[in-house]
């Protein structure tokens, strides 16, 4: 229970006290963290709130931590030199690349969002993908990203049942979303020479968006 509290304290904005930072339960990301994060946003969407409001609520539930990673990586991708790009990740100032990345992801995702199930499955996909990809990654610096990577190397198989369920419910959407997420992740991973917390935040955001966007175009169950 303590490690689950730690996981939720790190990946959500909910006030969970007395939790020491630990990734021992990182396997629970798709099964515990994702449904909890999506609970309020999906309820809002079900009750008639606009997709934009529901998506903003979901981002708020994550504490905007992953969105910050998206912005940092967006800035870093505009810098050609690897070492300079890594330094950009530490710069608190926001550049054109970061502003564009955040705006593009949020606006396009909200524009393609139209059902609570779509949002819930998108969040499960995001957490599953991050766990899976991190299991085969390396960190380029010490820190939380390194700790997440090391934990994922041991626990990445836990992502497979969640992805299998998604593939059963929406096979084409899941497949093309995995391919899209892999391409976008490799873009940042190769540019920076590895992963860190910002790169994983970027991955969490773009993978969720990929699933939501593709599910609006690819034939999926009528529940969508």
Curated annotation (Swiss-Prot):
Reactions catalysed, as given in the entry: alpha-ribazole + adenosylcob(III)inamide-GDP = adenosylcob(III)alamin + GMP + H(+); alpha-ribazole 5'-phosphate + adenosylcob(III)inamide-GDP = adenosylcob(III)alamin 5'-phosphate + GMP + H(+)
Chief localisation class: membrane
Keyword Coiled coil listed: no
TM region(s), chain numbering: 21-41, 44-64, 97-117, 156-176
PANTHER family: ADENOSYLCOBINAMIDE-GDP RIBAZOLETRANSFERASE (PTHR34148:SF1)
Name of the featured protein: Adenosylcobinamide-GDP ribazoletransferase
Domain of life assignment: Archaea
Family assignment from sequence similarity: Belongs to the CobS family.
Species of provenance: Pyrobaculum aerophilum (strain ATCC 51768 / DSM 7523 / JCM 9630 / CIP 104966 / NBRC 100827 / IM2)
Record's GO cellular component terms: plasma membrane
InterPro entries per UniProt: CobS
Function: Joins adenosylcobinamide-GDP and alpha-ribazole to generate adenosylcobalamin (Ado-cobalamin). Also synthesizes adenosylcobalamin 5'-phosphate from adenosylcobinamide-GDP and alpha-ribazole 5'-phosphate.
EC number: 2.7.8.26
This protein's encoding gene: cobS
Single Gene Ontology MF annotation: cobalamin 5'-phosphate synthase activity
Pathway it works in: Cofactor biosynthesis; adenosylcobalamin biosynthesis; adenosylcobalamin from cob(II)yrinate a,c-diamide: step 7/7
């Amino acid at each position: 229970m303590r490690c689950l509290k730690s996981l939720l304290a790190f990946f959500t904005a909910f006030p969970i006290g007395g939790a020491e930072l630990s990734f021992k339960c990182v396997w629970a990301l798709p099964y515990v963290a994702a449904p909890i994060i999506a609970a309020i946003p999906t309820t809002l969407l079900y009750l008639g709130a606009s997709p934009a409001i529901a998506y903003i609520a979901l981002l708020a539930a994550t504490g905007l931590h992953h969105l910050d990673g998206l912005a940092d990586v967006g800035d870093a991708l505009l810098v050609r030199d690897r070492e300079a790009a890594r330094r950009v990740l530490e710069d608190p100032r926001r550049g054109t690349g970061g502003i564009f990345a955040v705006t593009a992801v949020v606006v396009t995702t909200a524009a393609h969002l139209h059902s609570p199930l779509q949002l819930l499955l998108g969040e499960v996909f995001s957490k599953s993908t991050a766990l899976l990809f991190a299991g085969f990654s390396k960190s380029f610096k010490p820190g939380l990203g390194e700790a997440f990577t090391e934990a994922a190397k041991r626990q990445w198989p836990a992502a497979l049942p969640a992805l299998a369920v998604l593939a059963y419910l929406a096979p084409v959407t899941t497949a093309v979303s995995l391919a899209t997420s892999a391409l976008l992740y490799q873009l940042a991973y190769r540019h920076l020479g590895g992963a860190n917390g910002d790169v994983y935040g970027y991955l969490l955001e773009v993978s969720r968006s990929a699933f939501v966007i593709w599910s609006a175009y690819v034939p999926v169950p009528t529940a969508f």
